[in-house]
Amino acid sequence: MNSKICELLDIEFPLVAFTHCRDVVVAVSKAGGCGVLGAVGMTPEQLEEELKWIDDHIDGLPYGVDVLIPNKMADKDKKFDAEKLTSMIPQEYADFRADILEKHDIEANELRTIKTAATYMAENTKADGAKALLDVAFSHPIKIIANALGVPPDWMVQMGKDNNVKVAALLGTAQHAINQVKAGVDILVVSGTEAGGHCGSVSTMVLIPEVHQAIQPYGDVPILAAGGIA
């Protein structure tokens, strides 16, 4: 199947799958798509371990890494630590989680705790933490680096260009798409509200043609549809 996405990423099918599981990354890429590993909840050392495993099992096929760098936070040193993130979680969520663990006889210490993941996320959404993850990612033969929240910082886009890696970014409105293209993003991940609503409230099937029309004056930038896509 021939498309610009296939040409850019050197894949057989224009299918890109985000996952937190390295095994899924490998499986998707071996099936002709491009697996993308979510890294925001990892330390640089953990990411290195995961990517080394992928390199050893993926037979040289294309894959990518996804980070989460809110543009408004990327160059700021605001205190946004694990305690603050954890305090935002409703008690109902914590109770639901505890109930599931109890029903299935799972010890909480067998899982990565919310607090630990929140600690990494708080660090990795700031410039220093994000750059540390990107340094690890770009030391491996990735084909795509994606930002899952907003326009990537200029330095992230430049790191992609310097390493000959395509930069993708999620968006939820036509204006978001224009902002991303102007920032130099190579691939637009158009994420409708069916993806969980984190990018906006517009339905995927409405958003895709809106974005396609909006970016026409800015060049031929490929679009990946996300949200309600099975």
Predicted features, each with a name:
Residues 191, 221-230:
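Glycine-rich adenosine-cofactor-binding loop
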Residues 1-219:
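Active-site entrance/lid segments in N-terminal catalytic domains of soluble metabolic enzymes
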